């Protein structure tokens, strides 16, 4: 009779462990860092401008996170989360030596469908993903250099804006379980997106961005 409570306790623990092994309905939250580096292919600034006037952009690293929901043992929905990225815009082409001509903040809003390989309770699970990213650009700022290049002056400086666009995102990554709850996750993603920059002078420039994204974080599942 004394063994009955122990047996009941073991049964409860075993059922809980089995439930945790079932990934359908599991939520996973993570936090870490993310780097986005555009692979810029710039068109030329429209007339009137110096021929072959182009732009480039640097990469940016920011705190990030994400939410994953398991639809079943393999399929999942994932929403990466990050604070806005700040990118410096520099001259390229015939104005490659001009330096900084502006800056912008960018917020990628992404929804991904993922397929996770391996068993539901495997310690390491690689995954692939695909989805859509809405690249939101805001708080664009220009410099005196851009004003000088485009024929403006201090009283009427040249301003710029970037068009927010939708693009395709492809992703590969992996999740390493540290225990039943905590895990480490890393991923690499490529987004295919273009934008058009417009100056207050009326000139425009088309730019292919196609950024590469790297992220690494620690997460908790429940």
Model-derived features with residue positions:
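Hydrophobic alpha-helical segments of small multi-pass membrane proteins
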Residues: 109-111, 128-134, 164-174, 190
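Cleavable N-terminal export/targeting peptides
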Residues: 1-25
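Short loop/turn motifs that connect adjacent beta-strands in outer-membrane beta-barrel proteins
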Residues: 21-26, 74, 118-125, 178-181
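Flexible, solvent-exposed loop segments that connect beta-strands
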Residues: 41-55, 85-106, 136-164, 194-207
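Predominantly the C-terminal beta-signal and adjacent terminal strand-loop region
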Residues: 86-90, 179-222
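Gram-negative (and chloroplast) outer-membrane scaffold detector with strong preference
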Residues: 35-39, 66-146, 211-222
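Residues that define the transmembrane beta-barrel architecture of outer-membrane proteins
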Residues: 25, 59-63, 103-109, 124, ...
């Amino acid at each position: 009779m004394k063994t009955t409570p122990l047996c009941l306790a073991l049964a409860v623990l075993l059922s809980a462990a089995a439930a945790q092994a079932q990934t359908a309905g599991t939520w996973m939250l993570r936090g870490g860092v993310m780097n986005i580096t555009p692979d810029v292919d710039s068109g030329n600034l429209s007339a009137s401008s110096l021929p072959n006037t182009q732009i480039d952009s640097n990469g940016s690293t920011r705190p990030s996170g994400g939410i994953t929901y398991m639809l079943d043992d393999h399929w999942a929905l994932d929403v990466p989360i990050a604070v806005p990225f700040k990118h410096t815009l520099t001259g390229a082409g015939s104005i490659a030596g001009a330096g900084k001509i502006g800056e912008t903040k960018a917020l990628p809003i992404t929804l991904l469908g993922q397929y996770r390989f391996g068993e539901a309770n495997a310690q390491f699970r690689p995954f692939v993903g695909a989805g859509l990213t809405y690249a939101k650009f805001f708080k664009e700022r220009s410099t005196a250099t851009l004003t000088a290049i485009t024929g403006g002056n201090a009283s009427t400086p040249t301003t710029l804006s970037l068009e927010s666009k939708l693009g395709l995102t492809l992703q590969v990554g992996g999740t390493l379980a540290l225990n039943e709850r905590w895990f480490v996750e890393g991923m690499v993603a490529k987004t295919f997106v273009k934008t058009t920059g417009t100056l207050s002078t009326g000139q425009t420039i088309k730019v292919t961005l196609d950024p590469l994204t790297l992220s690494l974080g620690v997460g908790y599942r429940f």
